[in-house]
Amino acid sequence: MNLHEYQAKQLFARYGLPAPAGYACTTPREAEEAASKIGSGPWVVKCQVHAGGRGKAGGVKVVNSKEEIRAFAEQWLGKRLVTYQTDAQGQPVRQILVEAATDIAKELYLGAVVDRGTRRVVFMASTEGGVEIEKVAEETPELIHKAIIDPLIGPMSYQGRELAFKLGLTGKQVSQFTKIFLGLANLFLERDLALVEINPLVITTQGDLICLDGKLGADGNALFRQAELREMHDPSQEDPREAQAAQWELNYVALDGNIGCMVNGAGLAMGTMDIVKLHGGAPANFLDVGGGATKERVTEAFKIILSDENVKAVLVNIFGGIVRCDLIADGIIGAVEEVGVHVPVVVRLEGNNAELGAKKLADSGLNIIAATSLTDAAKQAVAAVEAK
């Protein structure tokens, strides 16, 4: 679960991380009042969306008057911002962040993720701030410096100092960076985060370090014990279908194709998408109903898939292990009858009670295409789309 920049900076403040004075605003009037609270300009106004590339899309602007702030707020509040990280519809702008402008001498990068290889939280720092860290990692990996956090010990001051020296910091900047490093590490661990980025972490013309931007991603599996983070959830930034799927504990990701896929198991779901692509099709989604699929969840999965107007056929690929194929068949029949499916449905069942499930589908009298293998299922789904 991602947080907005203004929410990230609210948490930064609690952990002693310096950031520009700022306020999140929902109306043009609030934005003007925020400028008055901050003091004299210039100010920076930023659209709050869960996507990068805001600046290039016009969603970040340096302004010198309250009239410009009002104009920016009127331009963007209630509208949608399209960046290279969004789809063609963009993300809705419900708040803008008004904050004091900062005189920048140099831009740095500081971030942390969970490294699956070492099973540790890994901090990354670089002198190449203000650009995508993925690009730096690909083109100049030697410019990324790392610190691995031992889960039994936690973050140590010496790790912060080591990173500071590698970034070329001197004097008071070393102690400032170490404080930021320790605060960010404690924030990451105590709040069950999966990602944190300060990009850029800037050195001002006065020589001080300031967190100019903030990006936080919370571990969705830990939200049950992070009540405050749950309250920060902004469903407007999610695909409505993905949000609906989450309520039913379905793993759904919307894609750009036209063949809806319903599969049990993430690995099988990815394999199904691959083989659809191999035979000339384009998956409309990733959808894993999981090992505990019920008739109700299968019905809901169908509703979610068919709510995508681009879907021209549905491919159901079930390997019965924990889940019984006959229960899946009941769910498919119930969904087709309830929703009124008007696109071809191709079903491949294997494993636990597969024969019983296939018989139920055959006896239902519904227009369901039975597949003998995964390859056959993919070919039939692609053919069904091409025939429409």
From Swiss-Prot:
Binds 1 Mg(2+) ion per subunit. Disulfide bonds: none annotated. One of its GO terms (molecular function) is ATP binding. Pathway: Carbohydrate metabolism; tricarboxylic acid cycle; succinate from succinyl-CoA (ligase route): step 1/1. GO terms for biological process: succinyl-CoA metabolic process; tricarboxylic acid cycle. ATP binds at K46, G53, R54, G55, E99, T102, E107. It is an enzyme of class 6 (ligase). Its cofactor is Mg(2+). Keywords: ATP-binding, Ligase, Magnesium, Metal-binding, Nucleotide-binding, Tricarboxylic acid cycle. InterPro entries: ATP-grasp, ATP-grasp_succ-CoA_synth-type, ATP_grasp_subdomain_1, Succ-CoA_synthase_bsu_CS, SUCC_ACL_C, Succ_CoA_ligase-like_bsu, Succinyl-CoA_synth-like. It catalyses: succinate + ATP + CoA = succinyl-CoA + ADP + phosphate; GTP + succinate + CoA = succinyl-CoA + GDP + phosphate. Its EC number is 6.2.1.5. It comes from the Bacteria. GO terms for cellular component: cytosol; succinate-CoA ligase complex. Residues 9-244 form the ATP-grasp domain. PROSITE patterns: ATP_GRASP, SUCCINYL_COA_LIG_3. Substrate binds at N264, G321, I322, V323. Mg(2+) binds at N199, D213. Succinyl-CoA synthetase functions in the citric acid cycle (TCA), coupling the hydrolysis of succinyl-CoA to the synthesis of either ATP or GTP and thus represents the only step of substrate-level phosphorylation in the TCA. The beta subunit provides nucleotide specificity of the enzyme and binds the substrate succinate, while the binding sites for coenzyme A and phosphate are found in the alpha subunit. Heterotetramer of two alpha and two beta subunits. Belongs to the succinate/malate CoA ligase beta subunit family. PANTHER family: SUCCINATE--COA LIGASE [GDP-FORMING] SUBUNIT BETA, MITOCHONDRIAL, SUCCINYL-COA SYNTHETASE BETA CHAIN. This is Succinate--CoA ligase [ADP-forming] subunit beta.
